[in-house]
């Protein structure tokens, strides 16, 4: 019991002496730097993905890619249209709606403002479309001070044929394989009787208006045009020249015939024969119903 109490009483003094000696030794061997402080770094690891990507994300990515491709295509188209516009060329190559009409009208007005003394070439390859949009283009063609030369290629049908005939007389042409079609405006009505009556009056107004415009473009009578547009009437370029809707056919580097435009010409004849002797094909004794 005495030994145990002696050792336990000596142990604290022994430990403190060892600590004092070690601290003094370390302080004497390694000088303590002043103001030494290490800033702890905080490691941030990305969260682990526990689920697969949503299909909606891939759908959005594909939509963005398609929109980018469409924007690139539209940009290329606008570049082409811009180059054509520098050459005073306007191209109508689609169905006619309000958006297309706004583009065509703005280009015509721009070119007319830049130089009203130079011709504007309006190329047409269109199946027609909205009558109101077509009337807007027609009015602008008549409004501009510059001569508008219309050139049909492919097809100029329905309301597009009105724009074709609206060009400056003597400067309305078509390519050899173009098809041209005129007809009366389409329309329909439903609902109450009074609504049907109102729509019917509007359709008749549009029909009379279109008939008057075609008669003015072709120098034909109102009654004759009214009869001709009762059904779809397709024409070749030569037949369109005969009808008075255009003034010549572009065949290579030549335009035939341009002057004079015969009033009565047999249809479906060789272009070269007409250019050599157009008077030979004049047949005033044949009535219109047999010619067309």
UniProtKB/Swiss-Prot annotation:
Q: What is its EC number?
A: 3.4.21.92
Chief location of this protein within or outside the cell: plastid
Q: Which Pfam family name is an example for this entry?
A: CLP_protease
Q: Which PROSITE patterns match?
A: CLP_PROTEASE_HIS
The record's listing under CDD domains reads:
S14_ClpP_2 (cd07017)
Description of how the protein assembles with itself and partners: Component of the chloroplastic Clp protease core complex which consist of at least 16 proteins: CLPP4 (3 copies), CLPP5 (3 copies), CLPR4 (2 copies), ClpP1 (1 copy), CLPP6 (1 copy), CLPR2 (1 copy), CLPT1 (1 copy), CLPT2 (1 copy) and 3 copies of CLPP3 and/or CLPR1 and/or CLPR3. Interacts with CHIP. The core complex is organized in two heptameric rings, one containing CLPP3,4,5,6 in a 1:2:3:1 ratio and the other CLPP1 and CLPR1,2,3,4 in a 3:1:1:1:1 ratio.
Supply the name of the protein. ATP-dependent Clp protease proteolytic subunit 4, chloroplastic
Q: Which residues form the active site?
A: 158, 183
- Where would you find this protein in the cell? Plastid, Chloroplast stroma
The family this protein is said to belong to = Belongs to the peptidase S14 family.
What Gene Ontology terms describe where this protein resides (cellular component)? chloroplast; chloroplast envelope; chloroplast stroma; chloroplast thylakoid membrane; chloroplastic endopeptidase Clp complex; plastid; plastid stroma; thylakoid
Q: Which domain of life is it from?
A: Eukaryota
Induction comment from the UniProt entry of this chain: Repressed in darkness. Levels decrease in leaves during aging (at protein level). Slightly and transiently repressed by high light stress (at protein level).
Name of the gene this protein is made from: CLPP4
Distribution of this protein across tissues and organs: Mostly expressed in leaves. Also detected in stems, and to a lower extent, in roots (at protein level).
Q: What does this protein do?
A: Cleaves peptides in various proteins in a process that requires ATP hydrolysis. Has a chymotrypsin-like activity. Plays a major role in the degradation of misfolded proteins. Essential protein required for chloroplast development and integrity. Essential for Embryogenesis.
Keyword annotations for this protein? Acetylation, Chloroplast, Hydrolase, Plastid, Protease, Serine protease, Transit peptide, Ubl conjugation
- Its EC top class is hydrolase
Q: Which species is the source of this protein?
A: Arabidopsis thaliana (Mouse-ear cress)
Give the organism's phylogenetic lineage. Answer: Eukaryota, Viridiplantae, Streptophyta, Embryophyta, Tracheophyta
> Could you list the residue ranges forming a coiled coil in this record?
none
* Targeting presequence: 1-65
């Amino acid at each position: 019991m005495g030994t145990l109490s002696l050792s336990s009483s000596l142990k604290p003094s022994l430990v403190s002496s060892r600590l004092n000696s070690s601290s003094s030794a370390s302080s004497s061997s390694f000088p303590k730097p002043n103001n030494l402080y290490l800033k702890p770094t905080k490691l941030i690891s990305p969260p682990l993905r526990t689920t697969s990507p949503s299909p909606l994300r891939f759908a959005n990515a594909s939509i963005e890619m398609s929109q980018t491709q469409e924007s690139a295509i539209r940009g290329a188209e606008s570049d082409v249209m811009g180059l054509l516009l520098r050459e005073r060329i306007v191209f109508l190559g689609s169905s006619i709606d309000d958006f297309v009409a706004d583009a065509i009208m703005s280009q015509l007005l721009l070119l007319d403002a830049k130089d009203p003394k130079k011709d504007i070439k309006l190329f047409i390859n269109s199946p027609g479309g909205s009558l109101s949009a077509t009337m807007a283009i027609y009015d602008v063609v008549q409004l501009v001070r510059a001569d508008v030369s219309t050139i049909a290629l492919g097809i100029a049908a329905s309301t597009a044929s009105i724009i074709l005939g609206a060009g400056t007389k003597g400067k309305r042409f078509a390519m050899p394989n173009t098809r041209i079609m005129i007809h009366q405006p389409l329309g329909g009505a439903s609902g109450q009787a009074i609504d049907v009556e109102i729509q019917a009056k509007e359709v008749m107004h549009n029909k009379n208006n279109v008939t008057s415009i075609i008669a003015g473009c072709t120098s034909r009578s109102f009654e004759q045009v009214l009869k001709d547009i009762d059904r779809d009437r397709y024409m070749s370029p030569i037949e369109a020249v005969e009808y008075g809707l255009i003034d010549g056919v572009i065949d290579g580097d030549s335009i035939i015939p341009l002057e004079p435009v015969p009033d009565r010409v047999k249809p479906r004849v060789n272009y070269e024969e007409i250019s050599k002797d157009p008077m030979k094909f004049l047949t005033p004794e044949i009535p219109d119903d047999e010619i067309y």
